Amino acid sequence: MSLKKELSGRRSVQAKVEAPGSTQSAVERRSAEAELRTLIAKFAPAHLGLIVAMRRWLRKRLPTACEVVYEYRDWFVISYSPNEHGYEGVLGIRASADGVKLFFNRCKELPDPAKLLQGSGNQCRSINLEGASTLARLEVARLTRCAADGCCRRRASGRGPLVPRPGP
């Protein structure tokens, strides 16, 4: 984070802080989208339509979130985070040849009366998505809203960047 200091008199110092990643140029965005398309083609080509629908659906709910993209083993992840650190994301897409999952970080804090969340992890759990129709379920929307509350509110407006991370 760059920090610019302006002296306004002898006794006081006023600091202006610029948020990192607040804008992404069109060239950077196109490059990041190309990297994402490469990962989709490598790991989950059969699920392209579902991944596109999920990104659109999540982007509506978290318009200023950073989409942090990285590969891990035989899948890739798109983490929706308040900053450029994927591990701080509250929601995520995990895609592989086996299928697509909607991941919830900090799942212990989420109310899940319909018992949709699968897995036994203390940190992350997921919902298997058979199709875009799963996203239309009221229970999924409620879980997503609860997970998104308080996240990604740091930037008042604008579109969050797509941030590809190098693979292993």
How would you describe each model-predicted region?
Residues 1-168:
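Charge-dense, helix-prone N-terminal extensions
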